[in-house]
Amino acid sequence: MIEIKTICQRIYNKIYIPRYKKQMGACGERVFFSPMNSEFIYENMYVGNDVHIAYHADMVASKSKIVIGDHVVFGPHVSIRGGDHCTDVVGKLVDKVGDDMKLPENDKDVIFEGGNWIGMNSTILKGVTIGRGCIVAAGAVVNKSTPPTIVL
């Protein structure tokens, strides 16, 4: 007997996932993700083919792009940050500074060249390119770009 939870998940996947994919800047084939318990800024995500993003992903880029090549797998609780808070506006607290006040250096694209495996609880920060074939270990914080085929 199929559980009610499984039936609800299948219905959700058939109805809502295609809608979320259409909101992306680009979305390839065989892309799997869990929007119910994740945070994405869809219009700034450019996703290739054969990509799997596990639950509780946090991929945020308000003025930059997150570009994910083909054959990339993200473990659970991965955080991708395409920018920083703007902290140099005099006379305003950080929570009162909107995206319209950001400087170009506050946000930079994050790029995954393809064939990557990003471990659970890892964080990738603005301006980073993860080279083709790289593996990022669980819990890693990556703030600099990597050459191809290394393990972090």
Regions picked out by a protein language model, each given a short descriptive name:
Residues 1-41:
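Extended, small-residue-rich solenoid/repeat segments and analogous flexible loops
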Residues 2-6, 74, 113-116, 136:
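Hydrophobic transmembrane signal anchors and adjacent membrane-proximal interface regions, especially
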Residues 37-46, 52-128:
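Flexible, glycine/small-residue-enriched loop-and-beta-strand segment within the central core
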Residues 124-152:
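C-terminal/domain-terminus segments
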